[in-house]
């Protein structure tokens, strides 16, 4: 169990060694950061069943299912229940026209990565009252309630709040309404 700086250094050393030797290596880890940074291809398993095999960027950008979408990324993807009707969803009190046509309409779980939520101008805007703001220097994690957005149940079967990862070096007051937004092209729909 290495400290954070040493883990980063060791990942780089192992990655460089792997490239220098040029052999096929199977590396088993429960650490998604290790898997994403060190692998050419990653196998995501749940309960002994393969969920997806892909390059790290493919896993992140095109997750095969809810499990993969929730597993890859830190913080994890936000999930909301929504109904697609006439090519549009209602999220955060806003009608969101979906840019990609779906073969069928109905109920979906919508995925939205925390880093795809932005402060300020975006095609779809809404206001939140943060329940917590964590400052990490160059970025902040803004936790907020669903505001009636119908958050999909988490793995434990309990509804959870939402999180935005925003690039912001100034201070954010946790008790003031914040304008958040997103681009509908960055939404994921899961049956």
Which residues make up each language-model segment?
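ABC ATPase nucleotide-binding domains
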Residues: 1-67
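Residues located in well-ordered beta-strands
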Residues: 55, 67, 81-83, 127-131
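Non-catalytic connector elements of ABC transporters
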Residues: 75-77, 86-191
